[in-house]
Structure formats: C-alpha cells, structure tokens
Amino acid sequence: MSRPERLAVVCGTATDVGKTWVTCGLLHGLRQRGVPVAARKPAQSFDQDGRPTDAELLAAASGQEPRDVCPAHRWYPAAMAPPMAAAALGREAFTSASLAAELDWPARAAVGIIETAGGVRSPLASDGDTVTLCHLVAPDIVILVAEAGLGTINAVRLSAGALRDGGAPVVVHLNRYDATDDLHHRNRDWLADRDRFDVVVSVGELVRRLLECPGGGRRD
C-alpha cells in the first residue's frame, strides 16, 4: 500500500455529525494552499434517493473520480453499516484488512484523507470498526468530528478514549459551532480545559493542525 506524506483519518462520534462536510472543507482548504490531496472512503452505504454519495462529494472536493475515492465494489445501496448493508444485499462479507489493502494512493498526493462511516465503534467491516482500521493504516492524525451541542462531552470522551490506543494524536472538531451559543462555548471549554482535548471549531484550524503534524507514519 502506497502512502502520502501525511495521512489523516476523519471519523465521527455518530452518524450525521458532518464528517463529509468537514472532509470536503479540509480538501478545499488544502488545495487552496497548493497542497496535492487525495481522499478515500473505504466503503460507503447509502439511500438511493438521488443525492450525491459521500464518495461523489469527496471526489468533487479533491478533483478525483468517485470510484477512485471508493472502489465500485464497496458501494452498498442500503442505509445501514457497510458490513450489514453487504449482508442485506446478498454480497460477500469483507474484513478490515481487505479495506486497508485496497487503499491505493496516487504518487502525487502530499496529504491523504480517509473518511470512515458512522461512529467510531460502528461496524466498518465484518471484523472491525474505525479503531481497527486506524491500527492497520497508522494515520499521522485522527480528526474526530462531533456535534457542538448537548451530549457532545459524553460522545467525545467515549469516542476519543477508543481512539487513543492507536498512537496518533486526536483532534476534536466541534461541527456547527456557534460562538454566540452559551452551551457550545461551555462544551468547548470543558473539553479543552478540563479534559485536555485538542479542540478546534473551524475547518481553517483543522487545516493548520493537519499541516503541522509530523508525517511519515508507518510506511511499507
């Protein structure tokens, strides 16, 4: 498996917290700085409702083809966790190792971003989740996307706790943060000051964190 100079995993505390929006913002921000990027979605499951899939959105943001972002055989048109969608559609089960092995990066990519599915402990393959994949790909940084409002402290603590054993620094991004919302402000301060998480509230801050992190990871 080839590897970019810097490799990031974007994951979430739950489904629909805005992982794809954040990842697209990162890709746009990096490209605006002249950084060659590539995005990968190891597997995607989705409703057939006519809306663009995550892979299509990430492809548009990174200047790639959707099936370069997510291989065609990993598109599952059923709105459930990817391994469950595969089973529901009568398709072959797959492992975390197979997802990791299918990650193929263009030689020009200075930054590669992997967006996972669902929450940190949501099934990503028949034998694992985002934590499993992080152990396999050894990212240089993990970006945990969370809601800014009620319930986020518990969700971040549980998700970040599961990710910390992977060795990569975890940056918490509070999505949809409103500086005028007292609860959002208190949640950010609690996570940063009491729990000592690295918390950001804008995509611009995320771009800087990603570019500042040491690259290299584990190379083949």
Predicted regions and their residues:
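Phosphate-binding/switch loop-helix module in NTP-utilizing enzymes
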Residues: A81-L124, V131
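Conserved catalytic-core segment of NTP-binding enzymes
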Residues: L26, T116-R196
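Short, low-complexity, intrinsically disordered N-terminal peptides in bacterial proteins
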Residues: M1-A8, V207-D220
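N-terminal phosphate/diphosphate-binding loop that engages ATP/GTP or pyrophosphate donors
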Residues: E5, W21-R91
